[in-house]
Amino acid sequence: MWTGWWLWPLVAVCTADQFRDNAVRLMQSTPVIDGHNDLPWALLKKFNNQLQDPRANLTSLNSTHTNIPKLKAGFVGAQFWSAYTPCDTQNKDSVKRTVEQIDVIQRMCQLYPETFLCVTDSAGIQQAFQEGKVASLVGVEGGHSIDSSLGVLRALYHLGMRYLTLTHSCNTPWADNWLVDTGEDKAQSQGLSSFGQSVVKEMNRLGIIIDLAHVSVATMEAALQLSKAPVIFSHSSAYSLCHHRRNVPDHVLQLVKQTGSLVMVNFYNDYVSCKAEANLSQVADHLDYIKKVAGAGAVGFGGDYDGVSRLPSGLEDVSKYPDLVAELLRRQWTEEEVRGALAENLLRVFKAVEQASDHKQAPGEEPIPLGQLEASCRTKYGYSGTPSLHLQPGSLLASLVTLLLSLCLL
């Protein structure tokens, strides 16, 4: 009965190697499309976006989760790079900052043309696959980047933006963020305001993917019900496995299934295990769970590399994707399901968004009501019958009191 027991560890190693070998084989023909990577933000923080600084060389930069050798080792074939600007830029220089981050992404493609190919559509991703390059797309992380302007939304589209996260971790004047669900922020729009609905419709018209990572549950529900095209969660996980409000609850996963939408699983420990520590197997648990609830077509990868401080053991950087794919194969995912999670699910969603677009339709023109905007530096141009500067709440009352007092003194 115990004959050859000493061979068991060797058999286990061989089996593990076989899963990884199969993962590599699959990824050579179907590389990863990752939904969210914050390398551009890391380049701003470390080098003030100066890519020609020798220290910023992406072939040798080792202080980030992402560099060119790691991307190649991880079989990353397409990346939505995050054009991110923090919430404290809202009502200030968010548009300027966003354009600068888009510029960084485009300069990455110019500086490393042998590695990166900047693309703006699903066909471009497939072209990059054929050329053995990393298709590089722009995802703008946070609705504050459009400064409540459909004109800015369109301008960012023309600069290459192909998804917009409706909020980051702050409300916009037209959409609520996930902190509303924790009680840390107050709901302003009950999901989406009338202008927020106009943003969603204009994104549909243009062919911009709607990203619901970071939004409140009410905003998830409103956008999923309103959008004519599938949406994505570019870097979120399953709420049932980790009760963090950045994750997606089961009833929303059902809406994801009904609409053909996509959840690209985040690797941040706090969203994976709800603890400071996590491991690769727990990330696979989230992938398993979303597949069970929403279907194999609803699963993707959104690692959030270079945007988080803690990553699971076994997924320390972008080179580790083959190990995660090997774990899915070990869990008896079919090759078809794995190819879907790697790339085909995102390509399906992207193509559906493109097909739903209608550039012949008249663009949205209704501006957000001036009273819904904040910050005293806004001018009145285009808004009739208003002061030359948009006054903060209470300022109008103060002005009326001053006027009445002056009349009494006459």
Swiss-Prot record:
Disulfide cysteine pairs (residue numbers): C87-C170, C242-C274
Recorded topology in the membrane: Lipid-anchor; GPI-anchor
Residues of the signal peptide: 1-16
Enzymatic class: hydrolase
Glycosylation sites: N57, N62, N279
Biological processes, Gene Ontology terms: antibiotic metabolic process; cellular response to calcium ion; cellular response to nitric oxide; glutathione catabolic process; homocysteine metabolic process; leukotriene D4 catabolic process; leukotriene metabolic process; negative regulation of cell migration
Binding site for Zn(2+) 1: H36, D38, E141
Protein EC: 3.4.13.19, 3.5.2.6
TM ranges: none
Alphabetized UniProt keyword annotations: Cell membrane, Cell projection, Dipeptidase, Disulfide bond, Glycoprotein, GPI-anchor, Hydrolase, Lipid metabolism, Lipoprotein, Membrane, Metal-binding, Metalloprotease, Protease, Signal, Zinc
Tissues expressed in: Expressed in lung, kidney and intestinal tissues.
Record's catalysed reaction(s): an L-aminoacyl-L-amino acid + H2O = 2 an L-alpha-amino acid; leukotriene D4 + H2O = leukotriene E4 + glycine; L-cystine-bis-glycine + 2 H2O = L-cystine + 2 glycine; a beta-lactam + H2O = a substituted beta-amino acid
Assigned protein family: Belongs to the metallo-dependent hydrolases superfamily. Peptidase M19 family.
Protein name per its UniProtKB record: Dipeptidase 1
Organism: Ovis aries
Gene name, Swiss-Prot/TrEMBL: DPEP1
